[in-house]
């Protein structure tokens, strides 16, 4: 069903025709669809008040709009004065006035929510289209808001966003008000923008914060489990990326990267002999496939390997010494990045955990396996490289937060990858 012509026009006139805050970006809300979805939403409510069931809901939205600079948006491009006039008419006028105001507040709310949620260029690489945040849907946003215990609280606390976002926004407001810490203002604004790409809603997902070297597993919108991780060293950084964990490999081989075979493995062979390879479970292979042929290690010119003149493929057999541990979780990407178990548990006790070649080593891989594989049927076996497909892929976000909420306050972590200054330079300056 469609809105009556006058209400449809009100919605269309109330939502700015141009991009309200980011001149270079297209609107995240398709305006014809917005009009139709808002009309359908109010038809379903059969005349029941939404915004005007409580005065606090309208004031919560107006306050957000007035402070839209905290979202790096321009408040002057939202029709705040028009909304206040419509709200006044709704409270003292006819049922028609209230319907007009309900439609207008809904349209601006959907527009603002979409503007806030639109991702900024913070360097996240999406290796799976399914992991990319979807534009805000008017129908879904309004229905979720309508089921909240308090619409005012839903709006005020920006519950359509990941919890990191409103927490960083509030902290940013406090710093701007104090006016004495420009460094922290820049830090909070940058990490606020990094939070825009995080999942919204209640689906399961994995969030790795490389700056803090921690992993959180979210279920039903809350952290269900957390663990330490080891991430890439400064020269081989864990990238900011998002993908979908689609399968796990039990009893994996570790395919030694060619540069490590040259810089670490070959010198050990030259110093200790071929017994080093046997002792550590390494074998030279023809290729990386599961049907690869094992090549006698004595046939390799290890001096040439160490000198970088010969490239050799080496894998480590499954077992207690294997660098991958007992399981690795795969989200297909061209960078060769994944989550995996590790036998090197002592590293998790260190405060700074940047020791990997880019992949994410897990403190408790068994716990993550239970969380994401759940009831997936598996056969107990010691066979190498058992692939187990997930019945439902799980989004994974490798993020980089040098400021984030924890225990009711904003904590900071060292910028171990020296990304903050570079990333901040690509973003617009937060308005004050």
What does each model-found stretch correspond to?
Residues 1-6:
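Positively charged n-region of N-terminal signal peptides that target proteins for export
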Residues 8-16:
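Bacterial N-terminal signal peptides
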Residues 19-20:
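Membrane-interface motif at the C-terminal end of an N-terminal transmembrane signal
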Residues 23-129:
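Cationic-aromatic interfacial patches
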Residues 25-33, 103, 107-111, 130-136, ...:
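Well-ordered beta-sheet/strand-loop patches within structured domains
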């Amino acid at each position: 069903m469609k809105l009556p012509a006058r209400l449809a026009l009100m919605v269309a006139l109330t939502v700015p025709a141009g991009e309200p805050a980011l001149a270079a970006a297209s609107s995240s809300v398709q305006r014809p669809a917005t009009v139709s979805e808002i009309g359908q939403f109010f038809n379903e409510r059969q005349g029941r008040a939404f915004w005007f069931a409580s005065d606090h809901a309208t004031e919560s939205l107006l306050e957000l709009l007035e402070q839209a600079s905290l979202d790096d948006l321009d408040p002057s491009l939202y029709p705040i004065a028009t909304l206040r006039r419509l709200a006044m008419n709704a409270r003292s006028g006819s049922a028609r006035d209230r319907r007009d105001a309900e439609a207008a507040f809904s349209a601006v709310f959907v527009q603002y929510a979409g503007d806030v949620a639109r991702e900024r260029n913070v360097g996240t690489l999406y290796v799976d289209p399914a992991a990319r945040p979807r534009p805000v849907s008017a129908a879904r946003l309004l229905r979720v808001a309508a089921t909240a215990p308090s619409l005012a609280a839903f709006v005020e606390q920006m519950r359509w966003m990941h919890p990191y976002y409103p927490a960083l926004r509030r902290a940013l407001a406090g710093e701007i008000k104090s006016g004495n810490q420009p460094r922290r203002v820049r830090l909070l604004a940058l990490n606020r923008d990094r939070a825009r790409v995080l999942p919204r809603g209640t689906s399961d997902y994995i969030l790795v914060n490389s700056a803090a070297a921690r992993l959180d597993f979210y279920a039903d919108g809350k952290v269900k489990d957390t663990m330490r991780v080891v991430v890439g060293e400064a020269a081989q950084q864990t990238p900011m990326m998002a993908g979908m964990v689609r399968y796990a490999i039990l009893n994996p081989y570790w395919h030694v990267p060619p540069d490590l075979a040259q810089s670490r493995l070959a010198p050990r062979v030259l110093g200790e002999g071929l017994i080093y390879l046997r002792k550590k479970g390494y074998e030279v292979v023809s290729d990386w496939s599961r049907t690869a042929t094992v090549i006698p290690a004595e046939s390799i010119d290890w001096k040439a390997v160490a000198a970088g003149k010969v490239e050799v493929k080496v894998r480590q057999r499954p077992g207690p010494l294997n660098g991958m541990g007992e399981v690795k979780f795969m989200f297909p990407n061209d960078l060769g990045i994944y989550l995996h178990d590790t036998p090197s548990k002592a590293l998790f006790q260190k405060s700074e955990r940047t020791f990997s070649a880019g992949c994410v080593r897990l403190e408790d891989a068994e716990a993550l396996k239970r969380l994401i594989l759940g009831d997936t049927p598996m056969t107990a076996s010691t066979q190498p490289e058992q692939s187990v497909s997930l019945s439902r892929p799980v989004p994974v976000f490798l993020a980089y937060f040098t400021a984030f909420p924890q225990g009711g306050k904003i904590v900071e972590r060292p910028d171990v990858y020296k990304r903050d200054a570079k990333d901040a330079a690509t973003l617009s300056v937060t308005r004050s």
